Curated annotation (Swiss-Prot):
One of its GO terms (biological process) is response to nutrient levels. Keywords: Disulfide bond, Hormone, Metal-binding, Pyrrolidone carboxylic acid, Secreted, Signal, Zinc. Residues 1-18 form the signal peptide. The keyword GTP-binding does not apply. It comes from Pseudocaranx dentex (White trevally). InterPro entries: 4_helix_cytokine-like_core (IPR009079), Somatotropin (IPR034975), Somatotropin/Prolactin (IPR001400), Somatotropin_CS (IPR018116). This is Somatotropin. It is found in: Secreted. Growth hormone plays an important role in growth control and is involved in the regulation of several anabolic processes. Implicated as an osmoregulatory substance important for seawater adaptation.
Length: 206
């Protein structure tokens, strides 16, 4: 009886130890899936907010937003798809992490219900942790220093989230949702390109 128990435990231990440890591609797949979900949610929130506006208000807010900028624009990132493709995997990861971090607090001010905002904040925190794991597994001394040293932290939001009324609140809400959608699109692009670089896929063009 004892011999049978020992054999059974040995088989169970062997089964556990043979389970594959998540590799880069698995971690990247999880990160890309999470950011894709966040990007879709950002698009939906923005579309819902726009649909609640009058046509004239939409045009006016869009015109104002084009002349304005997002707080995260202080984070230096590739200016176009060509620069994105030339950037190292680590640099894309570092930028993605900063963009995600810049929304962990500000996501609490997104228009919508408390449950929605809470879910978004939780997803952002999970994504940041996943990206940090990828940075740790992909960093290589000199590259870390050269890439991370060029990425300044975004400054505080100041009075961006101060309670406003009327048209000002509407404008701030529009800008916040537009910036959130824009940044989630950036992160999804960067993580997708970085994932492709480390795979066997020959074509990583955008």
């Amino acid at each position: 009886m004892l011999d049978r128990v020992v054999v059974l435990l040995s088989v169970l231990c062997l089964g556990v130890s043979s389970q594959p440890i998540p590799n880069n591609q698995h971690l990247f797949s999880m990160a890309v899936s999470r950011i894709h979900h966040l990007h879709l949610r950002a698009q939906r929130l923005f579309a819902n907010f726009e649909s609640s506006l009058q046509s004239d208000d939409q045009r006016q807010l869009n015109k104002i937003f084009l002349q304005d900028f997002c707080n995260s624009d202080y984070i230096i990132s590739p200016i176009d798809k060509h620069e994105t493709q030339r950037s190292s995997v680590l640099k894309l990861l570092l930028i993605s992490k900063q963009l995600v971090e810049s929304w962990e607090i500000s996501s609490h001010f997104l228009p919508g219900g408390l449950a929605e905002r809470s879910q978004i904040s939780s997803r952002l925190a999970e994504l940041r942790e996943g990206i940090q794991m990828l940075i740790t597994t992909n960093q290589e001394g000199a590259e870390v220093f050269s890439d991370s040293s060029t990425l300044p932290l975004a400054p505080p939001f100041g009075n961006f989230f101060q309670t406003q009324g009327g048209d000002e609140l509407q404008r701030r809400s529009y800008e916040l949702l537009a910036c959130f959608k824009k940044d989630m699109h950036k992160v999804e692009t960067y993580l997708t390109v970085a994932k492709c670089r480390l795979s066997t896929e020959a074509n990583c063009t955008l």
